[in-house]
Amino acid sequence: KAPFDIRLQIRDEGLILNDSGGRSIHFEPLFPGEISYSRSESLWLARGGVAAQHSSQPLSALWQVLPEDVRLSPHVYLATNSLQGPWWILSWPERVPGADEVLPPEPPAYRVLTGVVDGFGRTLAFHRAAEGDVAGAVTGVTDGAGRRFHLVLTTQAQRAEVFRKQRATSLSSPAGPRSASSSLVFPDTLPAGTGYGTDNGIRLEAVWLTHDPAYPDEQPTAPLARYT
C-alpha cells in the first residue's frame, strides 16, 4: 500500500518524516548516498547521490533496482520498511515554472511521494494536481509499461452540490417522493477532525485509462473502476 500522505520535512537540524498514521519520525541530516535506520519505527530513510551502496549495507541489493537517475540525484530521498522493498520515492511535484522564474529553481524544503519502485524494479510514478480544489492530491499514475491512468477526485462540497441537484430534480418530478427523507441534508464540509486526523473530504470517484502504448489509438469509453 502506497502511503500517499507521506511527507518529508528538510530542516537544518534534521529530517522529519510524517505519515498518514500521524507519526513524526526524526532522522539526522543525510549526506548524499547515506542511509539511516529508525529502530523504533523499523524504517530506513535514504538520500540519493551514489550509483551503488557498499556491499556491507543491508539495502545494497535493493538500491540497485532503482532507476539510475533516482540513485544519482542528491535531491531525491527514499524510504522503505523492508529489505525486499518497495522503495517510496520522495521528491517534489512537477510544475510549470513562471515566465520570470530563475531556472533551475531551488528544491523546496519538503518532499512528497512521487513514485514507488518494488523489489523487481517495477515503477509507478504519481502526478499531483497543481491547482484547483484538489491541488496537491494524486490525480495521475504512470506505470512501468507506460500506461497512464487518471484518478477522478471529488470534494465534499462538489458531492453536496450534486446531491442537492439530484434531490431538487427528484422532488420536482410528479412521481417524486414526498416523505421525511426529502429533508435529508448533505453537508458542504466534514467535521474538523477525526480519530485519524483531519479529513480533507477528497474522495476517489473513478479511474480512467488515458493511454496504453500497446493500443495507442484506442481509448476506453468507460472508467476501469467507479466508486460511490
Give each language-model segment a name.
Residues 1-228:
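Surface-exposed recognition patches
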